[in-house]
Amino acid sequence: MTSWQVKHFVGRTQYVVVPFDGQRVLRATSNDSATIITKPIRIDLEETPYLNWSWRVEDQLSGINETTKSGDDFAARIYLVIGDNLLNPATKAINYVWSSNQPRYSRWSNPFAGEKVQMIAVRGATDTISQWRKEKRNVYQDLINVFGDKGSEHKNRKAYRYLDAIAIMTDSDNSGRAATAYYGDIFFSTK
């Protein structure tokens, strides 16, 4: 965790590496808080387009509208960023979330950042909590799908080839609730 940068927005979500189900995982506990942990990376999506991870959510944040600022809370989310700074208009991000109320595979713009940060509900309101889930996403294809096909493979590669950062966030500051999530191994692969 020493290579991760921590940014507290509201309160302090606690991130701790713990043993769980025979593996070492990251436990995130939010109590009316929002803290993001970020790691600069340089991932070539031409070589390794697939993001693989496992996660487990212990709490649903039911009754909130996650597509609004007042409901933008998630027990678990993983950001992938193209660009050096989310304040830069050219920077784009995908935010894979475990949604408490949106259908699985739905997509919407982040209510704070707008169109440059796209939310994708990898898990939705009907998914069972308190169970490990393994995920695999073709990040390169997701970037094309959410930010648009540039018209040719060459232009798509130029726009979407490299990732510059990954971030993890468990937050419940807007709803004032509590949430706990666990994150297993996160890695990129060719298939």
Task: Give the label of every model feature segment.
Residues 71-120:
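Extracellular/luminal beta-rich ligand-recognition
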Residues 54-60, 83, 140:
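Solvent-exposed strand-to-loop "edge" motifs in beta-rich extracellular domains
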Residues 1-11:
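Short, tryptophan-glycine- and acidic/Ser/Thr-enriched carbohydrate-recognition patches
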Residues 48-58, 164-170:
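A short beta-strand element within beta-rich, extracytoplasmic domains
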Residues 40-51, 126-129, 159:
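Extracellular/lumenal carbohydrate-interaction signature centered on repeated Trp-anchored short motifs
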Residues 166, 184-188:
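Extracellular beta-strand elements of beta-rich domains used
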Residues 13-36:
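Short carbohydrate-recognition loop motifs
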